[in-house]
């Protein structure tokens, strides 16, 4: 895996990295959106794609689940969702989000993602009720289709 940075050169950089023998590319939550360069890199071919890391707490699990599934589909099943907490100052002052009990919050965030993915895969009712997140509605209109790859692996940075 090799770092992929901004969106402007993501396609050319991903193609050059593939030509040089890289098996995949990753992005981090920095000066650009963590997903956009991966969306562009997915057009290059058989590269593995990974967020390293997407910051979880400013996002909602349902929103992130949609982004992850779309990248899993775009990459042909070669996407890995890397998540992290960031640090208190960044979460509270930059993103305006809560940072209390980060280990418990991250654990629940991942559990919510898995519950959402399972509802999409099985068609069973979504019923996730946690301390930080609650997801109890998933109608067919909002359920991704045409995903033969299943949910992506989830890695959590500490």
Regions found by a protein language model. Name each.
Residues 54-60, 98-99:
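Glycine-rich "substrate-gating" loop/helix at the edge of Rossmann-like oxidoreductase active sites
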Residues 67-68, 73-158:
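Internal, glycine-rich beta/alpha segment that forms the wall or movable "lid"
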Residues 32, 59-62:
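Residues at secondary-structure transition points
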Residues 3-4, 30, 54-56, 84-88:
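Active-site beta-loop-alpha junctions enriched in small/polar residues
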